[in-house]
Amino acid sequence: MLVSYKWLKELVDIDVPSQELAEKMSTTGIEVEGVESPAAGLSKIVVGEVLSCEDVPETHLHVCQINVGEEEERQIVCGAPNVRAGIKVMVALPGARIADNYKIKKGKIRGLESLGMICSLGELGISDSVVPKEFADGIQILPEDAVPGEEVFSYLDLDDEIIELSITPNRADALSMCGVAHEVAAIYDKAVNFKKFTLTETNEAAADALSVSIETDKAPYYAARILDNVTIAPSPQWLQNLLMNEGIRPINNVVDVTNYILLYFGQPMHAFDLDTFEGTDIRVREARDGEKLVTLDGEERDLAETDLVITVADKPVALAGVMGGQATEISEKSSRVILEAAVFNGKSIRKTSGRLNLRSESSSRFEKGINVATVNEALDAAASMIAELAGATVRKGIVSAGELDTSDVEVSSTLADVNRVLGTELSYADVEDVFRRLGFGLSGNADSFTVSVPRRRWDITIEADLFEEIARIYGYDRLPTSLPKDDGTAGELTVIQKLRRQVRTIAEGAGLTEIITYALTTPEKAVEFTAQPSNLTELMWPMTVDRSVLRQNMISGILDTVAYNVARKNKNLALYEIGKVFEQTGNPKEELPNEINSFAFALTGLVAEKDFQTAAVPVDFFYAKGILEALFTRLGLQVTYTATSEIVSLHPGRTAVISLGDQVLGFLGQVHPVTAKAYDIPETYVAELNLSAIEGALQPAVPFVEITKFPAVSRDVALLLKAEVTHQEVVDAIQAAGVKRLTDIKLFDVFSGEKLGLGMKSMAYSLTFQNPEDSLTDEEVARYMEKIQASLEEKVNAEVR
């Protein structure tokens, strides 16, 4: 919200520096982004009168003689198409500073001396988006009463100061000058001075020519007025200046008035050309599938059943609360105008504007809420201004449908509760003073009082809101401070917090870098890297489809980061994230999803780069597995890895499911080449673990066990196996022998070739045995090996070589 300080001072009698006001507003609840003046950095720009203007042959240039209030005229060469004799213009004299700190100097153009520059608004730093279209390609023409030689700033209100407010959703009342004026008046204990709009009506009743009806509960109220004999023309300079300072482009005297009322009351309005209507009945209803509407921006919009539309003769003429239709817009030929003021459902407006990516000042205000008590007042004010500025006559009465509750909202409290919550010792007189300054009604006494809250402050509905208002206006800086009471208890980390720290320690120790990715993603990426996707949890009104669904995995987000870095030649990456994924087993519209703590990482590129001593070491499956092994060793968990091809986003031959007993903890594998190509990344290995499941499996601290004094014994065994037998199957067969003294199994060699026969391979293992209470004998170890050999022959048909 941009606030003109000049305009604000017309509404509230204050005389403090704008920066001081900004600081005061920030400390009382409305954040101020900054204060700027359009004239900042500009100098030596004066009013000039064009005395003569001659064309330069074979060019678009003009030689102008300009009166700038000096004894002698100045010759200035100008290329603007709208320069002509007899107009007042903005002249930057030699030495002047214009936008971007550009300094104007004397010069020659096509051999013609130019002693300055005739300026456009853009050359003074005014955004092209707010410059009136009639001056968009040329210079700004000043009012006829502008005095040559005087600075131009006051004529265009460039000497104003613009306060930019950052309005939070709960203070949408400050999206209007009236709302800001009430706030400033309360801060400085001043009265508001709102303009009185005088409206004169004709004897001809508007209801005789127009009817209004509402066919949906999404539009509580709709009102319209009819104006005749309208003369469309540019708005007066003061109104154009005000709108440009507020960031709005002036259009014409009718449209500019609706924008003025929007800023003044916070009430969105729209003007229709009555002569373009095909009927006399305005209906507010929900759109039908298949209906279309060309909006004011020239775009044809496909309407949905959730959209609110204004119709005439059952044809949409406007998207309610968002944008009008092109067919009924105000043009230079318009002479009969219908003014609209209404209240629309904010959620419906937000859904429509979000779906169409069509946001406007009006839709923003409907989404956040408007003052329902001033709808008719704003409509009357707009009619009054158009009658004054466009010579219009206003038909008698407002044509409306629906009802509005404009009565004050009553909220009760006690002085004891106020002081208890705020930690103060306020008197009832202090509370009375606060609500008097706010313009609220108050009845009762210290034991029990009731505050009557005007509809302009629709954010105040409960007792806690009263406490906040008292604290704001009384002054946060005046509230007493105290040290925390010494009655707390020492806290400790939860199990999941400890687990997250352990995981982070292992990941950082392995050289991984932590990142944080979005929990919202696309519907397609949400279910990637999941064997059994759950129901999608979708946002009702996403800002973009890229952030519309809660993720069910973290890998896709990490791969987006990998792709971003790879595209920028950062190819050796080891990234991890600890966060939450969301599993929805019920109806997303009725139930919240389960939040699952997870850990995921992605590795790509080289583990170690090539140097003069060693070859480059690329990332592979086993390097990724080693990180997980280190983690599980730290946690004291014995997990198993089982090959799988059920996760379609992963390589079917290089993927394993990680299990603890019968419970699946996660997966490890290479990103499927097709998926990697879609992300535009090289060979990448990923893993994801369910930390919530691991948390439930963690055991209490293992008691100290004395290191045995007795030596371990190792035996090597080479096995001839069929090629399809896996390492895990061999390990399972060895463990199935039930040898209690077996403490370690290591695979140290794998060989296949013609000598072994077709479809055969050799795998060599080192087996370690140890008795913590005694030395093992050769006979005992031999018996263990016999049991293991028998199990291998039975389970995997192994032949000991």
Swiss-Prot record:
Domain B5 residue range list: 406-481
Biological process (GO), any one: phenylalanyl-tRNA aminoacylation
Enzyme class: ligase
Cofactor binding mode and count: Binds 2 magnesium ions per tetramer.
One family name in Pfam for this protein: FDX-ACB
Binding site for Mg(2+): 459, 465, 468-469
The name this protein goes by in its record: Phenylalanine--tRNA ligase beta subunit
